[in-house]
Amino acid sequence: MSKIILDLQVACDHRCNLPSEDLFMYWLYMVLPLFRKKAEVTIRLVDEAESYNLNKIYRGQNHSTNVLSFPFKAPSPVKLVLLGDIIICRQVVEREAQEQNKILEAYWAHMVIHGSLHLLGYDHFIEQNAKKMEYLETKIMHKLGYLNPYETEIS
């Protein structure tokens, strides 16, 4: 049986429309046990200012972003369950969901799945890797009962 530890940090001013901690755990349990038996993840929900600062420092981008992932790599031969941190910007998620006609809960789920896959080593910088990552995201989203996150939803 898999064991996941979630450290949920809410660092944004407005807490309305945020998914519950149980939902975040549910989404993590749909991804992480496919790859690991044990994992510890921090999910930090932030406002645009913090997202902007982290995106500028770590990616050299001058804008806030929906999700950032910071995998933890333990030095060899240390084996830890700490997988890393997922930073999600509440305002960007809400805005993008509305602009893309996405169901807000489904978009939150997609950000958690996307961020989790980054922690597990997946990326989308090379087309072949992007296709594999998108396939996994879509498969997991379908298991959750959500539509393909890369297609526009009709409201």
Curated annotation (Swiss-Prot):
Keywords: Cytoplasm, Endonuclease, Hydrolase, Metal-binding, Nuclease, Ribosome biogenesis, rRNA processing, Zinc. The keyword Calcium does not apply. The keyword Hydrolase applies. InterPro entries: MetalPrtase_cat_dom_sf_prd, YbeY, YbeY_CS. Binds 1 zinc ion. Its cofactor is Zn(2+). Its EC number is 3.1.-.-. It comes from the Bacteria. One of its GO terms (biological process) is rRNA processing. Its main location: cytoplasm. Zn(2+) binds at H114, H118, H124. It is found in: Cytoplasm. Pfam families: YbeY. Belongs to the endoribonuclease YbeY family. Single strand-specific metallo-endoribonuclease involved in late-stage 70S ribosome quality control and in maturation of the 3' terminus of the 16S rRNA. This is Endoribonuclease YbeY. The lineage of its organism: Bacteria, Pseudomonadati, Pseudomonadota, Gammaproteobacteria, Candidatus Palibaumannia.
